[in-house]
Amino acid sequence: GILLNVSCGSGSLFEPDKRNALRAPSYPLISVDPYTSVWSFADELNADVTRHWTGKEQALLGVVDVDGVSYRFMGKETPEEGASVRFATAARQLSVNVLPTQTYYTFECGPVLLDVVFTAPLLLDDLDRMSMPVNYISWQVRSADQKKHEVRVSVEAFSSLAVNTEDQAVMV
C-alpha cells in the first residue's frame, strides 16, 4: 500500500540548500520503488496529470483554498475522474528546483504563496529509513499581502495510482 505523510510547517525545509537552472524532462514527486513512482512530465506541476515513470497516468491532485477561492497547484482534473473538488483557477507556478532527494515548488495562489516540497528519504547512510516505503509532501503558506487569510490545502490520490490497467477494480 501507499503511505502518504503530509505535514505543514515553517522554516528552512522550504528553502533549498542549492538552486539550479535545470529544465528537467520530468520532475520526481514520489519515488519509493520502480512500481511506486510518480512524476510530473510537464514544466508546470498543474499543466498535466501526474504520471508513472513509464508515462502511464497516476493522478495526484493538489488544491489550496484561499478565502473561499480554490487554486489547483498539482495535477489536472479530468471530468471522468469525478474529483471531489471543482475549481477553475490554476495556481501560478513561480519556481521549481530539483535536488537529489527533494523537488521544491513555489506557487502564487491569489494573495498567498504556497511552497511545496516532495521528499524521498533515500539516503544510503540510513538503510533503515531508506528501506521504508515512505515519501513526504510538505507545504507552507505565506501571505503575499501581509494580511491574514483562511487557507486549506488538500491532496487527492486517484485510483489510477493503485492499479496497473484501467479495467482493474479498486476496492475501497
Label the model's feature ranges:
Residues 1-5:
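Bacterial N-terminal signal peptides
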Residues 13-172:
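Accessory carbohydrate-recognition regions in carbohydrate-active enzymes
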